[in-house]
């Protein structure tokens, strides 16, 4: 796999990159470059870009001068942060508490990306959502279900890390099975161990589908980018179908915790 940059709109570019596990399996990763209404840019998540990709980003952003913020949305995605901060040291650096704890040598902004205070700073261009009913930062560092989801209003694009995955078979194989949107397989292990957690998760998903019902693109970290415009089913409908597929998991959790 080679890094590539997908132009979603005149304001949104999704950078598709490599992430290898044990040097063997490339599960991919991503970041997004977004132009704000004020003409400045932000990076959603951090990724160490190959030279040709960085040249494209720099050409769009006046050699990076117009990148005003690097916004880290997944608490367990930390590998590329120091490099991208070194590339654009003037950009304000935002993250979760885990980012700050793991990289205390960097100059972090005080507003955590999973906070209302942070969301208010960028509310003209984005909406953000944090899953309810699941651990945001799991004690088990192998469980990466939760992240802050971002919705760019102008391009109608959802940027999401591990929470959602979009699967599409390659080439002619895609005719054998329709693409589908699914929740990350670690959901059952990250639901909060308390009464009502499963129902809180259901309501969060339903709220998300309603609030972002106009979404036409979904960029997911370890899978693919989903483009839907004036097509059926909508992304909102696919989100609700994904919820239906995990209903047995939620019922099992309710039977155990209430």
Regions found by a protein language model. Give the residues of each.
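A general structural motif
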Residues: 38-40, 64-67, 90, 154-156, ...
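Short, flexible loop segments at the rims of nucleotide/cofactor-binding pockets, characterized by
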Residues: 19-23, 43-49, 69-73, 134-140, ...
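N-terminal/domain-start segments enriched in small and hydrophobic, helix-friendly residues
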Residues: 53-73, 77-79, 170-187
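Metallo-beta-lactamase
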Residues: 4-13, 43, 48-49, 98-249, ...
């Amino acid at each position: 796999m080679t890094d590539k940059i997908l132009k979603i709109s005149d304001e949104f570019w999704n950078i598709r990159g490599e992430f290898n596990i044990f040097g063997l399996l490339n599960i991919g990763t991503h970041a997004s470059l977004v132009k704000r209404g004020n003409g400045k840019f932000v990076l959603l998540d951090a990724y160490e870009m190959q030279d040709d990709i960085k040249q494209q980003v720099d050409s769009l952003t006046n050699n990076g001068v117009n990148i005003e913020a690097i916004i880290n949305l997944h608490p367990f995605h930390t590998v590329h942060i120091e490099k991208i901060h070194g590339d654009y040291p003037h950009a304000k650096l935002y993250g979760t508490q885990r980012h700050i704890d793991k990289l205390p040598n960097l100059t972090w902004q005080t507003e955590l990306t999973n906070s209302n205070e942070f969301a208010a700073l960028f509310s003209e261009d984005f909406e953000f959502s944090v899953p309810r009913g699941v651990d945001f930062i799991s004690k088990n560092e192998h469980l990466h279900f939760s992240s802050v989801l971002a919705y760019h209003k102008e391009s109608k694009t959802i940027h999401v890390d591990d929470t959602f995955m979009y699967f599409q078979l390659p080439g002619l194989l895609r005719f054998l099975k329709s693409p589908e949107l699914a929740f990350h397989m670690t959901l059952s292990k990250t639901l909060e161990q308390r009464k009502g957690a499963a129902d809180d998760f259901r309501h969060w998903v339903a709220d998300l589908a309603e609030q972002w019902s106009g979404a036409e693109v979904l960029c997911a970290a370890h899978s693919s980018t989903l483009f839907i415009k004036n097509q059926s089913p909508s992304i909102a409908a696919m989100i609700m179908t994904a919820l239906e597929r995990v209903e047995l998991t939620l019922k099992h959790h309710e039977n155990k915790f209430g």
